[in-house]
A protein has these predicted regions:
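N-terminal nucleotide-binding beta1-loop-alpha1 segment
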Residues: 53-86
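Conserved beta-loop-beta/alpha segment of the NTase-like Rossmann-fold superfamily
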Residues: 127-198
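Conserved core of the sugar-phosphate nucleotidyltransferase
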Residues: 172-248
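ATP/Mg2+ or Mg2+-diphosphate-binding catalytic cores
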Residues: 289, 296-297, 553-594
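An alpha-helical support segment within catalytic cores of ATP-dependent transferases
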Residues: 299-317, 417-473, 484-485, 577, ...
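ATP-binding pocket architecture of kinase catalytic cores
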Residues: 319-426, 440-448
Length: 594
């Protein structure tokens, strides 16, 4: 039986609080006393209450509005909360003395909701204890690293009915959960002035009719969501229909809702400001809990304090920087300036010699190429550097800047600096191949044929007898920074080692996505003259080997659950094009364009 909102609210209060007065119902629901009186008459006429209490028919009617379960989404990295989220999931942080997800579970249990599922992914093992402590169910989202949270909803779609959808890191100052809910809703709070949040427009009965990202003086989405069975039954087929589309991978579950908003009935549940907190940054949580940082058990912040000699309370303006393919980095400031904390990415300990990187950083500092470097822990892989305000990356399409980059390469190569470690694209590629095989047989079409070509190119290049010197080996535009004074820095020396001088050119061409004309021009800048055919051939051998090496590296990262994206295809294409071409140049001993 379908109940009007007023009838539902009145019947619910009568069921939960036997003997409750109409005045108390009005206070609890926000309905006027007259509306409560009208609802009492309506419920009596429908035989849903008898003598001011719910009848058996009334309790049966209320049952279809009973909340069945709750889903807590806890799979994501929460990159905006870096660097704390590098160490543990955001939902496990302690705010005002309580662990966020535990507080939320306790609020659900207090509302009589005992069927609780936690969807995990990033650092999933940190959540397993919740099964024993609270009796929750754990569901692992295997796609958390490559897809947005619509994948978490997909993992539990068969559990959706009358269901709360929650985020593990929300903090509710009052318990928002209820045993009975009238209709699907999204919690909203009011923002005075401009906001970047998702702002809602509503129609009759507060149904959400449209949503815009950003607005002013608007109600915006925040906190818990409730799917009633009608919403769940309509939403799941819509999600299934688009799930396998590549465009869906980056979509939040809300995007699928918005794409179908005319067909999905969801209302806005309005809350007073200060009821729901999501803490999008460290500074936000510190405003709410001034002692948060002091009470935080964080190796990252301990590292910062120990290296810089600052107080933990000084650390501020913490926010993530654009993440690299191998590491996670964040900005922070103290009273002494701005800095970058680099946290090693998952699996990098098997790929990178951090002792060599630390030694190379010191050499780069001494050469005046990277004086941002402050400290690196060679055992753990974390690093602290100075932050360069208003910095920009080198433009690989700007000939003058390319010339400067090539002069930096020549400076490094011609220095007497040396490392104990070596770097070789072919050896590295074979190392990555071994790591890849740990995930099972390599059944990528054409893989073995490409690996055989790489071996032949390596043999030809070695026979050239080219100089071995200190090389950067991740030498491309994103690792070049220009400051406000046009000073050029070459950063991130984690792949550095003693190698064939052409290694840096190979990386540059591949990772800057140079065409052949641009590559040849860069080579002219490197030699400060037109290169010989033999020099062209040798350097392009390293373009081929760099492409192949990073292609195999990408396959490893994808196998580990990381999302490399288009770079995998870029690396593959350079390997495919130049492995065959360079072999032809060696076999035929002349250069051919195209």
């Amino acid at each position: 039986m379908t109940l009007s909102k007023n009838d539902f609210l009145t019947l619910r209060e009568l069921a939960l609080h036997p003997g409750i007065s109409q005045r108390s119902i009005s206070d609890a629901t926000g309905l006027s006393l007259g509306s409560v009186n009208s609802a009492m008459k309506s419920l009596t006429n429908c035989n849903l209450i008898e003598g001011g209490a719910p009848s058996s028919e009334g309790l049966a009617a209320l049952e279809s509005y009973r909340v069945e379960n709750a889903i807590i989404l806890a799979a994501g990295l929460s990159s905006r909360f870096a660097p704390i989220s590098y160490e543990k999931p955001k939902g496990l942080l302690k705010v005002r003395g309580e662990i966020l997800i535990e507080r939320q579970i306790e609020q659900l249990l207090a509302a009589g909701i005992t069927d609780i599922t936690v969807v995990v992914g990033y650092k999933k093992e940190y959540f397993f204890y919740l099964e024993d402590k609270f009796g929750v169910s754990i569901v692992v989202n295997p796609d958390y690293a490559s897809r947005n949270n619509s994948s978490s909803i997909k993992c539990v779609e068969e559990r959706l009915g009358n269901t709360y959808i929650c985020s593990s890191d929300d903090y509710f100052t009052v318990n928002p959960f209820e045993q009975y809910v009238w209709k699907a809703y999204y919690a909203v709070e009011y923002a005075e002035g401009p906001t970047n949040e998702w702002c809602v427009e509503t129609g009759t009965h507060d149904r959400i009719t449209s949503v815009t990202i950003g607005g002013s003086d608007s109600w915006y989405m925040i906190g818990q969501v409730y799917f009633d069975r009608a919403f769940s039954d309509a939403y799941v087929p819509l999600l299934d229909a688009v799930y396998d589309s590549p465009a869906t991978a980056d979509k939040l579950w809300e995007h699928i809702y918005l794409d179908n908003i005319k067909h999905l009935d969801m209302t806005a549940r309005r809350y007073p400001a200060g009821t729901i907190f999501e803490f999008d940054s460290l500074d936000e949580v510190r405003q709410f809990d001034p002692m948060f940082l002091e009470n935080l058990d964080s190796e990252v912040f301990d590292n910062i304090v120990n290296v810089l000699g600052c107080e933990k309370s000084e650390i501020r303006d913490v926010y993530p920087l654009k993440q690299g393919l191998t590491n996670l980095s964040c900005h922070f400031a103290t009273n002494e300036g701005e800095f970058v904390y680099r946290h090693p990415g998952i699996g990098t300990e098997a790929m990178i010699d951090r002792t060599s990187e630390a030694a190379a950083q010191r050499i780069a500092y001494e050469l005046g190429i990277d004086d941002t470097f402050i400290f690196e822990d060679a055992d753990r892989g974390w690093k602290i550097s100075r932050f360069i305000p208003q910095a920009r990356n080198l433009d690989p399409r700007n000939d003058a800047e390319v010339a400067r980059a090539m002069k930096v390469a020549r400076l490094v190569h011609d220095s007497d600096a040396a490392l104990a470690s070596t770097f070789d694209f072919y050896t590295e590629g074979k190392h990555y191949e071994k790591l890849l095989l740990e995930h099972g047989p390599i059944d990528v079409p054409g893989y073995q044929e490409m690996a055989d070509l790489a071996r032949r190119v390596k043999e030809y290049a070695d026979a050239d007898g080219a100089p071995v010197c200190l090389t950067h080996n991740d030498f491309f535009y994103l690792n070049f920074l220009l400051d406000e004074n046009d000073h050029l820095y070459l950063i991130d020396w984690e792949y550095s080692g003693m190698a064939d001088y052409a290694s840096d050119f190979g990386t540059y061409v591949v990772c800057c996505e140079c065409d052949e004309k641009e590559a040849l021009r860069a080579l002219e800048h490197y030699f400060d003259r037109k290169p010989t055919f033999e020099e062209v051939r040798h350097n392009f051998a390293y373009v081929a080997l760099a492409g192949w090496c990073w292609y195999v590296w990408s396959l490893v990262k994808e196998a580990e659950g990381d999302f490399v994206g288009e770079w995998l295809y870029i690396y593959y294409n350079y390997a495919k094009k130049y492995l065959s071409k360079v072999i032809r140049w060696y076999d035929e001993s002349f250069y051919t364009e195209g």
